[in-house]
Amino acid sequence: MRAMNRYENMRFWILVLMTSVSGFTQGMLLPLISIIFEKDGIDASLNGLNATGLYIGVLFASPLMEAPLRKFGYKPLILTGGLTVFASLLLFPAWKSLWFWFVLRLFIGIGDHMLNFSAQTWITSFSRKGQLGRNIALYGLFFSLGFAVGPYMTRLVNVDERLPFIACSIISLCFWLAVFLLKNEHPEADLENVSFLATFQRFGKVWKLAWVALLPPLGYGFMESSLNSSFPVYALRNGINVDAVSMIIPAFSIGSIVFQLPLGMLSDRLGRRKVLIAVLLIGCACFAGAAFSKSNAIALFACFFVAGMAVGSTFSLGISYLSDLLPRPLLPAGNIMCGILYSFGSMAGPYLCGVIIKYTNGAVFFLLICMILFVLSVLIFRFKKTTAPVPRHS
């Protein structure tokens, strides 16, 4: 029994650490490439459009994930996804091209989604009653921790543009090797056919039962990608230097790290819906404040930090809420849909905010994020749960 508990703890922490590397990769790539392209004089809207490559990769891979997961299990998908990310990172220094880097980001999106979807579904499948919120909060916390550290790699661009990509690929490889210590497992089987068409049929069931739980990942994707991809462009155009940008962007993730676990545990006690409504409204107020901070780096740091404390947990809270609303056999499809909605938000964010920065004074993009968070809070408030809570194993 003691050996089993030791293995279960090791399994959980390896999955969580792999997630932190995924966050680290995304947290580095978004501001790093935005800064490189901005210095090269590339148009802000094209810069934002290039950032969507990662999320197009997620969207492309999403409908194809469930069948191989059920057939091969969690471990092979995590290993394949990690290897794809590692190889793509190594190729960035090979050729500096707008469209080549777009393709590499697309492959990183596919690899990251394979890794995150498998780890996320694995964690929700073995989490015991009363620990789901805590476990998913730790999952989100370590993703945020990686995401917070990632932007600091932008400083290496002053030494050599290739250095951040090489360093990130080596770090990814080291953590990827730890996955070989895990025993492969498969999702809980159901009686339905595992096929491309059956996956879309399960998507329909997930949407019918738990559409409201898919809104937080959508909003989080829009907000996160906008802050990491569009904010550096806004900052550089308003006299904020690269060093300040590399401090302001992680403030959001640091705030998220501080409150991720407490909010997850609080949601276990009070319910996901109440906690989600509260944090979305607080985040709305923070970004309204950021819109009036203009080029004040200290004020922006404070707004990002407090916003991170609140809405930095919306993705993990959305996953926990989804797990509350769905029967266990629908969890893989539900987690895929979280990734799809997150990707839609992440694709829309950099492009729309890039256009706004191009044609306005830039700060309007904070108000757009503010409006989206407010609308999501209203929709969640109006949701009336019609299904009984899904029982989890004790």
Model-derived features: positions:
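Juxtamembrane intracellular "pre-TM" segments in multi-pass secondary transporters
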Residues: M1-N9, N184-A213
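Helix-loop boundary and gating motifs at the non-cytosolic
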Residues: R6-Y55, G221-Y234, N238
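Structural signature of the two symmetry-related core transmembrane helices
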Residues: P76-L90, K274-A288
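Helix-to-loop junctions at the C-terminal end of transmembrane segments
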Residues: A61-G73, Q260-G271, I357
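Cytoplasmic helix-loop-helix junction between adjacent transmembrane helices
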Residues: L106-F142
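Helix-breaking motifs and short loop linkers at transmembrane-helix boundaries and internal kinks
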Residues: G73, A94-K96, G271, S293-S295
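A late C-terminal transmembrane helix in Major Facilitator Superfamily
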Residues: P329-Y359
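C-terminal membrane-cytosol helix-exit motif in multi-pass small-molecule transporters
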Residues: S169-L191, L376-K384
